[in-house]
Structure formats: C-alpha cells, structure tokens
Amino acid sequence: MVIKMGDIESENQDIENKIKELARNLLRGKEVDVIIGYTKGTVPLSSSPVFITNEEDVDKLVWNNLCYVNLANYLAPRIPTLYDDEGQKLKVGIVAKGCVGRALIHLAVENQINFENIKMIGISCNGIINRKRIEKEIGEREILETSILGNNIIVKGRDFEETFPFDEYMNELCKVCKVKSPPNVDGSCVGECLENPVVEDDFNDISDFESKTSEEKWAYIKDTLSACTRCVSDVLLQSVFRGPK
C-alpha cells in the first residue's frame, strides 16, 4: 500500500505546538483542571502518559509517532488523579486522536464518562510506528535513541544506525485508518475535530489476502504471529496434525 504523506518531522512539530497552545488556553481559562497527554518516554521507541495541572508544565507535552497508548484508559472510574480533595470529579482535557475519540464515545455509551466534564484536544493523527517490527529487525542490538528525520525513522545504538521509511514501518491499522481526528460530541472538542465523520468501508487488505495461494496465506500468518511465541507455537503445532489449509 502506498501512503501519501507530507514531511512527518514537520507535521509532528506542528501537531505538538498546537497541543501545547490549546492545553495552555484550557488551563489558563479554567475550562479544565487537568490535561492528560503524552510526554517523552523513559526508554527509546516509547512515550509515556502525563497529567498536567499547571500551565507552567505544558511544555512537557509532546507529540511523536510513538504516542501509542490510548489515553481514554485513564478516564476509567475511580482513578484518584481525576478527583479533587472533596471527591468531586475534575474537568479533564485529553489529547485525542481518532482512536482515542472513538474509545471515549464507547465509554460514554457505557455511562462510564460524561462529556460535560471532558474537553478533547483534537489532533489529526499522522500514524504510529510499528515498534515490534523495528525491534524484530534490530534484533538483540540495544537501541539507545530514536528520532524522525523527514519521512524516515532513525534508530541509533552502540556502533550502529539504521534508517526505516516511515510509510513502510507504520502500524498496519494506521495505514487504513479513515478517521484520524476525534468527533466533536456536543461541543466537547477543540482543535482538529470532525463534525459528521463519514467512513467508507475499504476491504482491500482482505481482498489481497484472499487472492493469495494457500502457501502464501500460511507464510503470511506465521510471519504475523512470529512476535508472539505462544501464538506461533500453537499454530505450528496444529500444522503438524492438520497441515496448512
């Protein structure tokens, strides 16, 4: 699949700047009590969730293609950070790409959250790196640093440097994602938000798989499951008795 994209490095900086601007405005205007976003991870190929309550800490917020955690998980009930000293729910601002927005809607449908207490900082997600694939190709070599340069992922370690094209090493789900920004539910979103998202079904990947021979399908399945020792062991064990279908 060919992915049309701009300069990912520049896009990341623009998205990060907008996140900081919107977060700062929400805190300054007392529209929210806390911002949930992403900050730099403690190890390469990672990011970490962060809770920001002071305008002075907004610069800790980052956006890069390693922001894989679904922040909607942190809006689950009974998380102490989201309540004040009197047990009242805080007003929350949350950095939301498309998949985070969809997760929030699901929580709202289950009556676990109320959009009256939530303000989404909407962004147009430009894709998340397939960490597992990169780690597999790097092997046992220790990764010390990762960065985006133009449209390439740069991975550095002791005595090595590898370059991976971003469009090829993006998560497969990101490649086919049609809703990159969150929906604007009852005016709960600022920034990049979708008013009436319309998604067209696209099953090209399924058609491609169905067109493969039995041997090609089997090779694809084994490669896909190779990152999970238990899964691939189960599949290979079954093949001993039944053989590939």
Describe the residue ranges of each PLM region.
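Iron-sulfur-associated redox domains of electron-transfer enzymes in respiratory
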Residues: 1-217, 241
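Long, well-ordered mid-to-C-terminal structural blocks that present hydrophobic/aromatic surfaces
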Residues: 215-245
